[in-house]
């Protein structure tokens, strides 16, 4: 059986990937998000061929469930169809978060991975129309569609489609704030959904916490080192790799610091709350209950 931790970005998918990755009856590849089925976000895809995708699972044991934690699946317009055509019995786990908190955290993540360069989220939000037309795209952005923030967290459109396409027995929708208020209970729910025995996990520390670059141009240099892999980099890498040290890692660690979401004004937060109000209502309708954590 195969399963997908299908979304949403910045809603705990990395933590769940980490938890399930240590379960003896689960195999998750080292590449957390291959984005193989997300063909409408080509710049985000880490794996683009069938052979390469299958190769991610070559070390799986016959008894293990095979998982894919590409958080783009839920907001892609094609991924769920592609997956269901290939694996009609596939199961999907979707974590959802207060959309205002999620979109702000996603903006901070895009700043960190260099897909975004506008640190002021309000300005980045207002650039969406221009960017949809191909203007004001950062030179370091690998996939411009990621800059359409409202589109990534379009719960009102995406979740009803998801519910219609995937049978109830093959989908699990979890609320981020509730899951991490009692992660042990949430994790047991996930294990039961996947038909797994409890592995007894008791450590539920946060994974993929918010972070920032100290200096952006150093982050850009780091990406060029890794992507280009030129003669100077290869020479330096071969010279010190026997120590278990990689030059790109040294630079990345030096340039990394803990960081939260950039502050926004009360007026803009109120605007975001109003924008996402229909999305909150959609989620509550699908779950058949209020989500108190999202009420402001």
PLM regions: where:
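A general structural signal for well-ordered secondary-structure junctions
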Residues: 26-27, 89, 232, 281, ...
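Short clusters of hydrophobic/aromatic residues that line enzyme substrate/ligand-binding pockets
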Residues: 37, 155, 291-294
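The conserved 3'-phosphoadenosine-5'-phosphosulfate
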Residues: 32, 160-270, 274, 288-296
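PAPS-dependent sulfotransferase catalytic core
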Residues: 1-75, 82-93, 99-139, 166
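Aromatic-acidic/polar surface patches that form glycan- and anion
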Residues: 6-9, 46, 72-76, 147-155, ...
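PAPS-dependent sulfotransferase catalytic domain
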Residues: 47-59, 116-203, 229
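Alpha-helical packing segments of well-folded alpha/beta enzyme cores
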Residues: 53-56, 79, 155-159, 186, ...
């Amino acid at each position: 059986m195969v399963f997908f931790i299908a979304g949403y970005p910045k809603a705990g998918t990395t933590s769940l990937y980490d938890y399930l990755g240590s379960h003896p009856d689960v195999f998750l590849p080292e590449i957390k998000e291959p984005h193989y089925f997300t063909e409408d976000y080509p710049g985000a895809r880490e794996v683009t061929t069938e052979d390469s995708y299958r190769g991610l699972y070559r070390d799986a044991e016959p008894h293990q469930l095979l998982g894919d934690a590409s958080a783009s699946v839920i907001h892609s317009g094609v991924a769920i169809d592609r997956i269901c055509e290939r694996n009609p019995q596939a199961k999907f786990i979707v974590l959802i978060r207060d959309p205002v908190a999620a979109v702000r955290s996603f903006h901070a993540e895009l700043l960190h991975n260099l897909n975004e360069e506008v640190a002021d989220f309000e300005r980045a939000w207002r650039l969406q129309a221009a960017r949809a037309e191909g203007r004001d795209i950062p030179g370091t952005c690998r996939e411009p569609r990621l800059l359409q923030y409202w589109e990534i967290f379009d719960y009102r459109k995406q979740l009803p489609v998801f519910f219609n396409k995937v049978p109830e027995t093959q989908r699990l929708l979890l609320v981020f704030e509730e899951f991490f208020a009692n992660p042990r209970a949430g994790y047991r729910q996930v294990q039961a959904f996947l038909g797994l025995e409890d592995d007894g996990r008791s450590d539920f520390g946060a994974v993929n916490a918010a972070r920032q670059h100290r200096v952006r141009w150093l982050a850009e240099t780091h990406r060029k080192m890794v992507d280009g892999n030129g003669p100077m980099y290869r020479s330096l890498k071969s010279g010190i790799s026997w120590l278990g040290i990689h030059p790109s890692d040294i630079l990345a660690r030096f340039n990394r610091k803990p960081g939260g979401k950039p502050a926004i004004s009360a007026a803009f937060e109120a605007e975001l709350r109003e924008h996402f109000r229909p999305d909150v209502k959609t989620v509550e309708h699908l779950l058949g209950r209020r989500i108190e954590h999202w009420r402001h």
